Amino acid sequence: MLIHPQFDPVALELGPLAIHWYGLTYLVAFGLFLWLASLRVQHSPFRETGWTRRDVEDLLFYGVLGVIIGGRLGYVLFYKPGYYAAHPLEVFEVWKGGMAFHGGLLGVIGAMALFARTRGRRWLEVTDLIAPCVPTGLASGRIGNFINGELWGRAADPSLPWAMVYPQSGSEIPRHPSPLYQFALEGLLLFVVLWLYARKPRATGQVSGAFLVGYGVLRFIAEYFREPDGFLGLLALGMSMGQWLCVPMVAAGVALWVWAGRRA
């Protein structure tokens, strides 16, 4: 059995400026996106349609806005609507934490639609470009969660070699290190599968559909090891909010994949 190291959340202090590990994981995520998306635009079908490195940089700008705005609004609406209805100004206090992946996904989808419209490109062409690059950012974020000692898992069998006690949880119960599970599933595994899948010619929209299905299924599985949010607990059918949000995500992914294949 292991004990969470309780890392200092501040990686570096430069005078009055404190640089947090979680912020650095975002920088790593953005850097990986630039690198991987730049590789993708060098190959078919994006090379033939005139994609450039500058397009990728602009795409990142749109994506960052989508992640921040969508992630925050998703947390507010999906997880704590009552609280923020009573404290509306706190919606803007992003530095206090509170982001939701599913909201961030919707924000990015909207941002990609706006980018596609301003550049005269097909929306699904844009989402197909970025889909295989996203899991590395998710992996980076989960490392940030682990360093911060947050989003710990449900109680685990003490005999499990990697069961971990989180002192910050207020108990000595051994738990699953769920951020590391999500790092492996939604990050590394999903990246490898999508990157290999996208290397072959696919109908426009199928890579995006594969991402929705892949993430939804893997997140659904990971949620069984993650402690539900204390203010929500488990919902209908013993499922967490994260799992319920994955259900329409997987359904949309399957529908998109089938529709794109028939339309090709």
Swiss-Prot record:
Q: Give the chief site where it resides.
A: membrane
Q: What is its EC number?
A: 2.5.1.145
Q: Report the membrane topology from the UniProt record.
A: Multi-pass membrane protein
Has UniProt tagged this entry with the keyword Cell membrane? yes
Keywords, in A-Z order: Cell inner membrane, Cell membrane, Membrane, Transferase, Transmembrane, Transmembrane helix
Named from the GO MF annotations, one term is: phosphatidylglycerol-prolipoprotein diacylglyceryl transferase activity
Pathway in which the depicted protein is active: Protein modification; lipoprotein biosynthesis (diacylglyceryl transfer)
Q: List the disulfide bonds.
A: none
Residues engaged in binding a 1,2-diacyl-sn-glycero-3-phospho-(1'-sn-glycerol):
142
Q: Identify the GO cellular component terms for this protein.
A: plasma membrane
Give the subcellular location: Cell inner membrane
Tell me one GO biological process term.
lipoprotein biosynthetic process
The protein's enzyme class = transferase
Keyword Membrane appears in the UniProt entry: yes
InterPro entries the record matches: Lgt
Segments passing through the bilayer: 17-37, 59-79, 95-115, 205-225, 241-261
Matching NCBIfam families: lgt
Q: Which HAMAP family match?
A: Lgt
User: Record's family?
Assistant: Belongs to the Lgt family.
What is the role of this chain? Catalyzes the transfer of the diacylglyceryl group from phosphatidylglycerol to the sulfhydryl group of the N-terminal cysteine of a prolipoprotein, the first step in the formation of mature lipoproteins.
Q: What is this protein called?
A: Phosphatidylglycerol--prolipoprotein diacylglyceryl transferase
Native organism: Methylibium petroleiphilum (strain ATCC BAA-1232 / LMG 22953 / PM1)
